[in-house]
A protein has these predicted regions:
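Conserved beta-strand in the GNAT
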Residues: 60, 66-74, 83, 88
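Conserved acetyl-CoA pyrophosphate-binding loop and the N-cap/start of the following alpha-helix
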Residues: 93, 97-105
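Conserved active-site alpha-helix within GNAT-family acetyltransferase domains
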Residues: 100, 124-142
Length: 151
């Protein structure tokens, strides 16, 4: 099996949509997951457009010619650093280095674009994602705490 990481292309749209649905189904397990899912619009059938937009970089990774995960970077102008908005690897391909390879590719792409930092989301309790980012040198810089009021 040969691993690969590459920038996504329009024809990856169907796979990206499937990965997005799988990833979102797992968000509810973690504190804040439901709220994060509500704050990040579902891309759905618009992945083909996202992968060609200059605002985004989307990577896919897998083995041989089978994609098994994705990572999405948002370069929105209102942020002071590009944001890894989503990273997901299918459960049967975890612990094989695909997530690490995509995070490293994301860092390289952000450096190439002249960024001096990169941010990423990791939910409380999601140790796999936190550890993935920490292996690449990303560290926590902000925790947002919430208390629901009334209603």
């Amino acid at each position: 099996m040969q691993p690969f990481v590459r920038q996504a292309i329009s024809s990856d749209g169907g796979e990206l949509q499937r990965f997005e649905v799988e990833a979102r189904s797992q968000l509810e397990v973690f504190r804040g997951g439901f709220r994060l899912a509500n704050e990040l619009p579902l891309v759905g059938s618009l992945w083909a457009e996202r992968v060609i937009s200059p605002r985004w970089t989307v990577f896919v990774a897998g083995f041989d010619d089978v994609a098994m995960g994705y990572l999405c970077i948002d370069y929105a102008a209102q942020r002071d650093a590009p944001l890894i908005e989503a990273v997901y690897v299918t459960s049967d391909a975890r612990e094989l280095g695909l997530g690490d390879a995509m995070v490293n590719a994301a860092i390289e792409e952000c450096v190439r674009r002249g960024a001096d930092a990169i941010d990423a989301y990791a939910l409380p309790g999601d140790r796999e994602t936190k550890n993935l980012f920490e292996r690449s040198g990303l560290t926590a810089r902000l925790l947002i705490v919430t208390k629901k009021l009334g209603k």
